[in-house]
Amino acid sequence: MVNFTHVSEFVLLGFQGGPGMQAMLFLIFLILYGIAVVGNLGMIVIIWVDAHLHTPMYAFLQSLSLLDICYSSTIAPRALANSMQEDHTISFGGCAAQFFFLSLFGITEAFLLAAMAYDRFIAICNPLLYSVSMSHQVCVLLISGSYLWGVVNAIAQTTMTFRLPFCGSNEINDFFCDVPPLLSLSCSDTFINQLVLLGLCGSIIVSTFLIVLVSYIYIISTILRIPTMQGCQKAFSTCASHLTGVCLFFGTVFFMYAQPSAIFFMEQSKIVSIFYTMVIPMLNPLIYSLRNKEVKQALRRSMQKLSL
């Protein structure tokens, strides 16, 4: 008979190294998190105060900025604390909560990026129907639906993962509570969990990516048919920033979770984890502001008001 011991806490191993290494990690995490919070908060405020940006496109962007703040805040505070102290433990409940919110915000962002692609598709391919197809009610429905699916996924994943019996080592070879390292600590067969992970999360990621892909195939084909170069550039500039953000998000997710489990627990995987949990939330406000003329104009108007 196997003796299952109840695990009351986990140890987040993170990156191994001496005090110098940990101090450097603290500085890196602090800079990434600080820029992510300030940048995304600034984006939310600019869209909120500038009436010219009160459109569905920027409502989605505002929601994305809020998601990025929440997403990075689920990881960064714990990572900062662990890099400055020897005790890297996290309670069972704390690990479950972190896991839940990571699942919630990650899947919600995938749906939100798909909704943003659909918004650009309607705006460029069917501009005469835009006010009807992307009304305020539709916009609210798409945003709330994204969160709803995120909650459903998070509840399913968290319930199935933390109902597993854990025995032996309680060391998670990462700096946050993620699915693969948690499943490796379970004493029981995790085939059903892996099947649900592949079926639920995999289908969500693939389906949202396909929505984005099909939308941009139509968008690009429509842009290429615009007779004037100026019109073509203007149309492409409205979706170039979103396309960049989509490539960063889905490219990193596919790289992270589509690789064989045998090579998952490598230091490179931890670096990729930092990229999609901290670097992407930091880059998004820069991408959407520096490559968007309307946001830059709104920023100038806000600066002029402050200088008066």
From Swiss-Prot:
Record carries keyword Transmembrane helix: yes
Cellular location(s): Cell membrane
Gene Ontology cellular component annotations, sorted alphabetically: plasma membrane
This protein's record includes keyword Cell membrane: yes
Principal subcellular localization: membrane
Annotated S-S bridges: 95-177
A single MF term (Gene Ontology): G protein-coupled receptor activity
Extracellular membrane side: 1-26, 82-95, 159-203, 267-269
Membrane topology type: Multi-pass membrane protein
Transmembrane portions of the chain: 27-47, 59-81, 96-116, 138-158, 204-224, 246-266, 270-290
Alphabetical keyword list: Cell membrane, Disulfide bond, G-protein coupled receptor, Membrane, Olfaction, Receptor, Sensory transduction, Transducer, Transmembrane, Transmembrane helix
Gene3D superfamilies linked to this entry: Rhodopsin 7-helix transmembrane proteins
UniProt cross-references to SUPFAM superfamilies, sorted A to Z: Family A G protein-coupled receptor-like (SSF81321)
Cytoplasmic compartment segments: 48-58, 117-137, 225-245, 291-308
Function: Odorant receptor.
Family according to the record: Belongs to the G-protein coupled receptor 1 family.
Name by which UniProt lists this protein: Olfactory receptor OR9H1
Lineage: Eukaryota, Metazoa, Chordata, Craniata, Vertebrata
Record gene name: OR9H1
